[in-house]
Amino acid sequence: LMNLVYPDQSVKVQEGLVNAYLESGFLPEWASPGHRGCMVGNNSASVVADAYVNGIRGYDAEKLWEAVISDAHKVHPEVSSTGRLGWEYYDRLGYVPCNVGIKENAARTLEYAYNDWCIYMFGKALGKSESELEPYRKAALNYRNLYDAEYKLMVGRNEDGTFARPFSPLKWGGDFTEGNSLHYTWSVFHDPQGLIDLMGGDQPFSEMMDSVFNIPPHFDDSYYGFPIHEIREMQVMNMGNYAHGNQPIQHFIYLYDWCGQPWKAQARIREVMDKFYTAAPDGYCGDEDNGQTSAWYVFSAMGFYPVCPASGEFAVGTPLFKHVKVNMPSGKSFIVNAPENSNDN
């Protein structure tokens, strides 16, 4: 959203990332203000790539290329959320195993695969050679290594290649981060068609999507020992196992666009906007987390959403308004017209 509406501020963000790398040897993953042990993934690569792919310039992009390559193959010696915890396993096996003492391993694997795709896209935009890019293009497909055809879900995997058993799609935490397999299976932002193919086509894919809403908001909180607030929010929202109060699944509804059922996306998007973003004391649906939850609303209210940052593409949803005009910094206007738009249409 910042790249679209406030590109001048985005330049400053990129300059800040350069400075963080120069001063610490790592890009920040959860800065407050220094490196903090929080969350998983190497998503600074996404922030860097999305800015450059969307035309943001005026900073040292080559230094950021050096940084994303460096961070993909090391971990901070004191802050394990910075860089890539488990990178040695990931580079060798194509996934972070669930039985080597690394928590939230499946979530890490899925995010690293997307991060590798971001590195590939960033390098491609910079004009890097195919020999430099090919390892990251291949690694972007590592999400396939966690797909368990028995369940049609992403499942933690042991170092010897076997899938974790016993397995419950309702178990929060463990191999995942503040969520369960029903949430994280869809974390293939960069290759929805590949995930559709794994599941056997549009129909089984859409049926699996439907199941997220149809399965009651039951849960297994044994990893935490108590229901964390994200679990409680899922229960209160009462949209099955859809947990909009936390970020891992917020792109999920838009995936109906990929399997030929955009009307389902439109209905669910409007339901979320109407129910979980209101001017009431309990009118906000969960974590804000660096602006993501509100950015989801702003994009969705305008009628489109960036399912995959760094792709330069937007999925079509349903605007709240019949006419939306965005005044671009260039002086041009971006306009969305939906004259027949209504609560029923």
Task: Tell what function each PLM region has.
Residues 18, 45, 55-141, 145-335, ...:
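Active-site core of glycosidic bond-cleaving carbohydrate-active enzymes
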Residues 24-44, 49-53:
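Aromatic/His-enriched, Gly/Pro-containing loop or helix-boundary segments
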Residues 10-14, 45, 49, 65:
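Generic internal hydrophobic packing segments that stabilize the cores of diverse globular domains
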Residues 7-32, 217-224, 230:
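Active-site-surrounding "flap" and adjacent substrate/cofactor-binding loops of secreted or lumenal enzymes
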Residues 1-2:
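Core alpha-helical transmembrane segments of integral membrane proteins
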Residues 341-345:
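C-terminal beta-sandwich/jelly-roll accessory domains of carbohydrate-active enzymes
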